[in-house]
Amino acid sequence: MARLSPLHLRVQCAIRERQLLRPGQRLLVAFSGGQDSFSLLQILRDLQPRWRWQIFVLHCDHRWSADETACAQFLQGWLQQQGLPHAVETADPIRWDEAGARAWRYQQLDKWARTWSCEAVATGHTASDRAETFLWNLLRGTGAAGLVSLDWQRRLDERDPTSAWLVRPLLGLSRWETEEFCRQYQLPVWPDRSNQDLAHGRNRLRLEVMPYLKQHFNPQLEAALNRAATLLQAEHELVVAQAAQLWLQVYEPALPGLRRDPLRAAPLALQRQVMFQFLSLLLPHHPTFEQVEAGIRLLKAGRRSRSPDYPGGGWLEVRGDCVVWVAASQPASFVP
C-alpha cells in the first residue's frame, strides 16, 4: 500500500466523518485534468486498497478551443497508460455559457454513472471553490440554497432520487494545497488557459476581487466565507426539513396545486421553500426569486387572480382554496 501523506489522511477523515463513500463502492471521478481533479484522482487511487473501491473516470471536452481538445487527447492517453477505466465525452460546439456547459457535464456524469453502475460521483471542488461560489452567488442576490449550493454531498440530479450521490471529498482543502500536492507527486496537470480570461465574471472574481478583499479586508477570506456557508447550511437544512412537513399538509397532486390556508399561516421562509419546491416540479429549471414571489402573492389574492406566465407558458391561478398550476394547453374550468 502507498504511504499516506497528511493530505491523504485529512481527505480520508472527511470521507469517514461525513459518510461520503463506503468501502467497495463503484466510483465515477469527474476529471478535468486540472490540479484539483488530479489531486482527487491520485488520493482516491492511493486510498483504494484500503477501501476496495472500483474507480472509473470521465473527462468532458467542451470543444471551446483547440487547447481543450488537445487536453482531452492528452488525458485519454494518460488514462490508458494508467490502466484506468475511462470515457471521454465530446460536446457539439456550443457558445461560452457556463450554466449550459455545467448542465451538459452533469448530464454526462449521470449517464456514465448509470452505465457503470456507480453509486457516487466525486468532483474535485475545494474550499477555495466553495468560497468563490458563496461570494459569486451573494453578488447575484441568490437565496440560502444558492449560497450553500457547494456542499459536501447531494444527489447528482436533485429531482431524481435514483441518481448517484455527488460527493466532494476535497472540500476541506484549499487550492494552494492541491497545487502543492500535484507538485509533490509530479502529476501532469494540464493548465486551463480559459481560467485566466477576465471577460468571464467568475474568473475576474477569483483573480482580482478576492485577492483585493484578502489584502484590504480579511486575509482569511476563504476561511470566513466557508464558515458562513457552513453556518447557513445548518439553518437552510432546518427550513427544508420543516417545509417537508408542511408540504404534506398543503400539496394537492391531483390539481396540481397548494392549499392556501395552511400555507398562508406558515412563516414566510417556509412559504417560499414550499413554493420553490412546487415550481421546481413544474418548470424546466429551478425557479427564480421573482417567480417564487409571484406565487407567494397569490396566497392572499382574490379568486381567479393569476401570476404572469412562467417559462413554457403555464401560470399559477387561485381556484377555490388552492393555488393551482394551469398548463398553457389546459382548458379553462369553472371553479367558484
From Swiss-Prot:
EC number(s) for this protein? 6.3.4.19
Write down the SUPFAM superfamilies for this protein, in alphabetical order.
Adenine nucleotide alpha hydrolases-like, MesJ substrate recognition domain-like
Reactions catalysed, as given in the entry? cytidine(34) in tRNA(Ile2) + L-lysine + ATP = lysidine(34) in tRNA(Ile2) + AMP + diphosphate + H(+)
Q: Name one GO molecular function term.
A: tRNA(Ile)-lysidine synthase activity
Q: Where in the cell is it found?
A: Cytoplasm
Q: Is the keyword Ligase in the record?
A: yes
Answer yes or no on keyword Transit peptide: no
Q: Name one GO cellular component term.
A: cytoplasm
Source organism superkingdom: Bacteria
Q: Which residues bind ATP?
A: S32, G33, G34, Q35, D36, S37
Protein's GO biological process: tRNA modification
Q: Which UniProt keywords apply?
A: ATP-binding, Cytoplasm, Ligase, Nucleotide-binding, tRNA processing
Q: Which family does it belong to?
A: Belongs to the tRNA(Ile)-lysidine synthase family.
User: Per its UniProt record, what NCBIfam families does this chain match?
Assistant: lysidine_TilS_N
- Biological function: Ligates lysine onto the cytidine present at position 34 of the AUA codon-specific tRNA(Ile) that contains the anticodon CAU, in an ATP-dependent manner. Cytidine is converted to lysidine, thus changing the amino acid specificity of the tRNA from methionine to isoleucine.
How does the entry describe the domains?
The N-terminal region contains the highly conserved SGGXDS motif, predicted to be a P-loop motif involved in ATP binding.
Q: Which PANTHER family match?
A: TRNA(ILE)-LYSIDINE SYNTHASE-RELATED
State the protein's name: tRNA(Ile)-lysidine synthase
Q: Which gene encodes it?
A: tilS
